[in-house]
Amino acid sequence: QPDPTVSQQAFMASSELTLAYIQTGDAQVDAVSKAGLTGLSQMLFARTSIEPATPAGLDLERDALVFYPLIYWPMTPNQPLPSQQAYRKLNAFMRSGGMILFDSRDGDIAGYGAASPNGRQLQKITYGLDIPVLEAIPPDHVLTRTFYLLQDFPGRYTAPEIWVEAAPQAAQKVDGMPFRNLNDGVSPVVIGGNDWAAAWAQDAQGNPMFQVGRTPQA
């Protein structure tokens, strides 16, 4: 028997813009993800004509991914690796135009990434994905012009590098435009460690739940 809650969640996401996050099994991390995407959804509503629905927490093994334009995936050291079926869903999601924002949440550590438990788990999880060639995000990428990430992509931390799909060699700058045509700037993955959900999270009064803008510590 299908889970009626899951069916209702998928139905709502198919009719309204819904941001989603991967449930890690860590209750605190999952709560921050939900609060962060709720805050981001509220910012979208306040600053644009978009009125997103309540963010959805996704179980990779059970839930459909196709209805969500953006999936936020925070790393924890002990979250399980996806099954082969889940990897197939993830790869199909990226091929169909969806974006996964991988967040190792370790931008407060100098030399973050593979040097941290979260970064090592990120490497293990992404090994089974069809991730394209990546590059450090260029200054003319479309994501540098979005209000919720801004030029230096601050989160709770301000780690130095964000990775996206590498631009094709043929990408050209159009006369009169301040940026190149990077395939509309669409990248199926964005990888960083700035703990974005914590930066977006707000309490009931609209105040930030966490200190933001910290730089890596040696």
Would you name each region that the model predicts?
Residues 10-15, 63-67, 86, 93-95, ...:
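Extracellular/periplasmic catalytic domains that process cell-envelope and extracellular macromolecules
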Residues 70-119:
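Short alpha-beta junction capping motif
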Residues 18-21, 69-73, 99-103, 133-136, ...:
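Structural recognition of the beta-strand scaffold that forms the well-ordered cores
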Residues 32-39, 43, 85, 89, ...:
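Extracytoplasmic/secreted proteins, especially bacterial periplasmic and envelope-associated proteins
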Residues 1-70, 74-77, 196-197, 204-218:
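Aromatic-Pro/Gly-enriched surface loop or interdomain linker
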Residues 40-51, 74, 92-96, 124-132:
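Structured segments of extracytoplasmic/periplasmic soluble domains
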